[in-house]
Amino acid sequence: MKIAWGSEVEEKLREMLADTPASYRKYLDPDVRACAELHAHRMGKSEVDEDAMIRGFITTIPRHLRDGIHEVLGVHNIDLQYYMPVFDEANPLDHNHTHVS
């Protein structure tokens, strides 16, 4: 599934990944994009918006590393309270831990 990305959302993702080491970013970027597109699809959206992108960003990061995401989201003025439930979600690309709905 390929869902369109708005230019503002693309830029926001680049900004959020900017502090990630390049060696990790090259793997993280495509996974975040795939997760964001999946979240957008599940929400019935035809384009990845900021909400779907942030959900994809959070769920792509392994759970044991998600504490560091709070700082990244805070720097980019993203409402942490709104996204707190997302921190408990599994990575939708990790088929070993997801259930078919």
Language-model region placement:
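Non-catalytic accessory segments flanking P-loop/AAA+ NTPase cores
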Residues: 1-101
